[in-house]
């Protein structure tokens, strides 16, 4: 999740963020490696992508809009909406970028959850992971697809194509 993700624009903010994240890590698991990943903040509108891979082919189950700005310093997610109100060419760019990211890290089969930001320079992948979406968002997929997320994932695990179409049913 976004626990421990803190935006820091200046060195004093970075120092305070490191102390805070180290406390979170120590509380979560005192034996865990306390390495911290520091990344550049990418401005833009954020989307989540849920899909499945079958023999390396990516099939999108849904794109979720994150309509509330996630500009920090903390990144609490409040609501996901699907389908997003975006142009067809932007949807295509998001899906192509996620598929390329999956190939780049060697993912070929199973569920995919990705998060992207879109700005004037293009689509930026923030995360791509071989897992399903968390929280209550799986229920949104059922509303949009007519199948439960579990049914789709089990079918994919058995080697069947997901063969689902998002009928455009709004959910959020």
Language-model regions, residue ranges each:
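A short beta-strand motif that forms the metal-chelation/ATP-contact edge
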Residues: 51, 122-132
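Active-site "cap" helix and flanking loop/linker of ATP-utilizing ligase/carboxylase catalytic domains
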Residues: 93-114, 129-172
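Internal nucleotide-binding/catalytic subdomain
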Residues: 4-121
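Active-site-proximal flexible loops/turns
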Residues: 47, 122, 134, 138
